[in-house]
């Protein structure tokens, strides 16, 4: 192996150590800070061996210059308010991946990607940290994940930190406000008094139907057929022959005599006049003028032949 490439190798031990999933060896803590800054110009090589160690090295820069450059980057990191983090995970299948993100606020976000060996999906995890909680190295990060093979959860999981925290906070506040408004409306609706009942609402516009349903289907609405007796029909026919139009006084008198109401007598006379006109058009009945003259002649003859009109024997 080339000596120039061996001078700048970084060794990261990946094992099941709980929260210390991303911890360099002692003496290489300042080199870890250099990863967040600009890298040296050269081709870096990544390799891992069978015991689960990942090696990162460069081959185009001397060891002393590279060490000085990394120390400068570490000193520059002390004055920065936020840095982008690199999360490295290693699984038993030999597949490695890492993700970085620069935060716009002082909070620090760490992103990790885990490949599920059983499914083709990818497990994404992002957690937020504050700069005040970070030390000179990332050994105590609580968001790192390092487990045995097959320990990666099967279901996809996604959690956003950093810039998404403000958005999630605003979204939760907006949702709470909407729920409060909707609950307030429901409360007002429940507490509202019942509607006032006006007098015109109490009036029954449609009187109850007293007619029975016909044997063969329903009849017209609000139509009550009056069944007249033979005596009632005879008296009404006699009255119709004398006068086709009744005065109100005569109508009331006939209704009281026949045990009917005024409306029933009025409607019967209307129907009888329509029936008479229909018969006259068809020629089945004599004209009304001829009938009236015959009735007048008959009345005059009966009056002249009455016993009261005959001369007395004393005269």
Swiss-Prot record:
Coiled coil location: none
Chief location bin: nucleus
MF GO annotations: DNA-binding transcription factor activity, RNA polymerase II-specific; RNA polymerase II cis-regulatory region sequence-specific DNA binding
One Pfam family linked to the record: Homeodomain
Portion annotated as DNA-binding: 221-280
Compartment(s): Nucleus
Stretches for region Disordered: 177-200, 272-315
Span(s) of short sequence motif Antp-type hexapeptide: 197-202
Disulphide bonds in the chain: none
GO CC field: nucleus
Regions of compositional bias (Low complexity) in chain numbering: 302-315
InterPro entries noted in UniProt: HD, HD_metazoa, Homeobox_CS, Homeodomain-like_sf, HXA1/B1/D1
SMART domains found in the cross-reference section: HOX
DNA-binding is among the record's keywords: yes
Keywords noted in UniProt: Developmental protein, DNA-binding, Homeobox, Nucleus, Transcription, Transcription regulation
Family: Belongs to the Antp homeobox family. Labial subfamily.
Role played: Sequence-specific transcription factor which is part of a developmental regulatory system that provides cells with specific positional identities on the anterior-posterior axis. Acts on the anterior body structures.
Protein name: Homeobox protein Hox-B1
Species assigned in the record: Cyprinus carpio
